[in-house]
């Protein structure tokens, strides 16, 4: 079949699904995207309240720099990259009982001076991480396929290897915890806590468990020549541009359409679609199906057809992260002067209190960035929480109220929050995320970047079922709009090669 005769169904209009769909449509395939939400973008979409625009989950973007993954893909699609400003510092991290933050500066030298001041004796570790990062980054920029599942995948992986990549191989099974011990820093509480806070944002797990090779990249992506970006308008512009590209190239994006089943019937693949507007259901069929869903949802979609070993592996995964998020619309007076765009707060050190201390990751809008009316701002604060808490039968509204009040109290130690400055308050729980994104139990950020689930040991885009593909943060290289865009590009290359 020529491309124009081949049909591809994409399940999920997250950034991974939309990117795959846009690239496939541009390359001549017939593409249709189904998503249950009203607004595209998944965890990188937005909602509006009283003149405020809130980014739902993702608030910063990597890969917009020249040669970055979004830049490469948008060039191929022949669409304009959205306007954005650098996040500098990428994050201001407040450790317990400290009034001055650790600023993760974009400038490499400035960041080096900052970490030498904050963490004396740790420079050998940072230099080691930076060396691993550059080797890994050069490798990733050659588009390897991880983990490989057939000869062609393995050949793409081999072609991406160079002599300088080999130096990273001995560390494939190492964690950041191992590196801290190796450099004699295992008992540096401030450093370990800082790494825990930063890594949890990207890897979903703490320093002790995070795969070293993944961490090297996660910890270096904030600095030049890369960097984290704050999109002008809102996160929604990313999805909007991708949808324009899909529709320009003849593809369709159908929102409020839920896919509940994938069936393999010989060469053709079928998916069961339900229109949430008309409640009609039907089966649509295609040559390929690309599932932009979590691996947990993927197994549910396959039902009885899921290979036993695959389903068992998913069942045995450690529970993924879930988040509780508070969205505040405030007067600018609530924001301290020179407030950085992203902050982290940790209420106490683990050993100092009886329960697990709460940490918040906070994003603050800039004046004139399109997220709030003049003289006003948005504050979005998220914390990791356990799914068990939210699905354990406790009074849901009561729990939501308790979490909201606690988060606002913690934020009030830095921001000026009171009845005069707070205009709008809203919260999202794991159940909210599940309802709007369809992600099983509202999980965020993928399967967690432990050694057992990252890179070579992760879930492949090429699934055990022929021409049924997995894309998104359950696959290499993991979470974030840049991560899922790499995942999408991999799937598109694999589909092209197989067809």
Predicted regions and their residues:
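N-terminal glycine-rich phosphate/pyrophosphate-binding loop and immediately adjacent elements
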Residues: 3-141
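A conserved FAD-binding loop/helix module that cradles the flavin
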Residues: 58, 473-496
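Short loop/edge segments at beta-strand edges and connector loops
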Residues: 88, 239, 255-257, 263
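Active-site/ligand-binding neighborhood in enzyme catalytic cores
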Residues: 130-249, 439-451
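A glycine-rich dinucleotide-binding beta-alpha-beta segment and adjacent secondary-structure elements
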Residues: 190-205, 361, 417-477
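Mid-domain catalytic core of redox enzymes
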Residues: 231, 257-373
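A conserved beta-strand/loop element that lines the FAD pocket in flavoprotein oxidoreductases
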Residues: 246-259
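C-terminal segments that line or cap access tunnels to active or ligand-binding sites in enzymes
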Residues: 331-434
């Amino acid at each position: 079949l020529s491309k124009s005769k081949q049909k591809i169904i994409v399940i999920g209009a997250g950034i991974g699904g939309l990117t795959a769909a846009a690239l496939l449509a541009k390359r001549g395939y017939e593409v249709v995207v189904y998503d249950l939400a009203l607004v595209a973008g998944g965890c990188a979409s937005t909602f509006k309240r009283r003149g405020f625009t809130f980014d739902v989950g993702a608030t910063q973007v990597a890969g917009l720099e020249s040669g970055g993954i979004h830049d490469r893909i948008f060039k191929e699609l022949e669409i304009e990259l959205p306007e954005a400003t650098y996040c500098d510092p990428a994050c201001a991290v407040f450790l317990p009982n400290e009034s001055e933050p650790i600023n993760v500066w974009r400038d490499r030298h400035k960041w080096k001076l900052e970490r030498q001041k904050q963490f004396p004796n740790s420079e050998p570790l940072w230099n080691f991480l930076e060396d691993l990062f550059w080797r890994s980054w050069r490798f990733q920029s050659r588009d390897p396929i991880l983990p490989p599942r057939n000869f062609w995948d393995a050949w793409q992986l081999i072609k991406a290897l160079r002599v300088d990549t080999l130096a990273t191989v001995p560390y494939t099974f190492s964690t950041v915890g191992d590196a801290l011990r190796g450099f004699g820093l295992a008992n540096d509480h401030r450093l370990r806590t800082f790494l825990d806070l930063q890594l949890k944002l990207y890897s979903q797990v703490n320093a002790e468990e995070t795969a070293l090779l993944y961490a090297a990249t996660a910890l270096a992506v904030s600095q030049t020549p890369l960097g984290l970006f704050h999109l002008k308008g809102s996160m929604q512009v990313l999805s909007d541009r991708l949808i324009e590209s899909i529709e320009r190239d003849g593809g369709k994006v159908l929102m409020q359409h839920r896919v509940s089943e994938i069936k393999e019937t010989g060469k053709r693949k079928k998916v069961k679609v339900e229109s949430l507007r008309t409640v009609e259901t039907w089966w649509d069929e295609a040559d390929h199906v690309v599932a932009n869903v979590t691996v947990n949802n993927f197994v549910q979609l396959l039902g009885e057809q899921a290979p036993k070993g695959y389903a068992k592996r998913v069942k045995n995964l450690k529970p993924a992260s879930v988040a509780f998020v508070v969205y505040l619309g405030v007067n600018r007076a609530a924001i301290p002067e020179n407030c950085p765009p992203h902050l982290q707060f940790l209420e106490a050190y683990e050993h100092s209190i009886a329960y697990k201390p709460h940490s918040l990751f906070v994003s603050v809008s800039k004046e004139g960035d399109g997220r709030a009316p003049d003289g006003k701002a948005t504050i979005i604060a998220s914390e990791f929480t356990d799914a068990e808490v939210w699905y354990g039968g406790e009074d849901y509204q009561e729990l939501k109220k308790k979490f909201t009040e606690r988060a606002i109290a913690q934020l009030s130690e830095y921001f000026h929050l009171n009845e005069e400055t707070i205009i709008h308050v809203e919260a999202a729980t794991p159940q909210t995320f599940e309802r709007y994104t369809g992600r099983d139990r509202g999980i965020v950020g993928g399967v967690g970047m432990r050694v057992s689930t990252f890179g070579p040991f992760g879930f492949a885009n090429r699934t055990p079922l022929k021409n049924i593909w997995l894309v998104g943060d359950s696959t290499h290289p993991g979470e974030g709009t840049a991560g899922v865009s790499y995942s999408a590009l991999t799937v598109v290359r694999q589909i092209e090669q197989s067809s």
